[in-house]
Amino acid sequence: MKRTVCGILSLSLLLLGCGSALAEGGQGEHRLLYQGHGSLRIVTAEGKVIYVDPYAGEGYDLPADLILVTHGHQDHTAVKKIKNRNDGCQVSTWKEALVKGEYKTFDLDFATVEAVQAGNNRNHNIKECVGWVITLSGGMTVYATGDTSTTEQMAELAERNIDYAFFVCDGIYNMDMDEAIACAKLVNAKHSIPYHMVPGKLFDQKRAEQFDVPNRLIVPAGEEIVLE
């Protein structure tokens, strides 16, 4: 599996001078809003705003600095919901992040974004999907699996000491709960969070509680947490 480091995003952001959104309730802290289903919003300590797989829930009002999309299914690609974008805002999808078998890493001035393996099941071609490992200032890491089943690369991620990892567990289009638990134990993040639990629902408390791992963190849809 090949990797390429791309500096284009970083250069364009620096030249165009992206604006910032103040982190609500805590400037100087990284904050993450789980919007529901497979959608996340991160506000960095510097006030930069990152959206991952926009589609579900609320909280699309903050101007974006970066939009990440794991694959092409409609419940992950509603980028038009993000109407406000700072100058130089980039949209990075699986198409830019996985080219001829090479998983890209993008170095920005406020984060490093690494594409990793995803898909690997009958509903998601591994050649057309990525997960994202986002490294923020201070070394804080967030891993969003995207729609996936077990991948070979998850064993490598165990060596990265990931801080927060989101695991799909719907068992219909992706891995089921037992497989998600096994993947979470393999990656062994400091905090393992179930998401993308039931198609058509933002969140399911009963299913979230079935995600039985020692380092489980349940984050209901619409809840914002401080990454620490």
Predicted regions and their residues:
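A short helix->loop->beta-strand "cap" motif at the edges of active sites that frequently abuts
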Residues: K48, N84-Q90, N188-H191, V213-P214
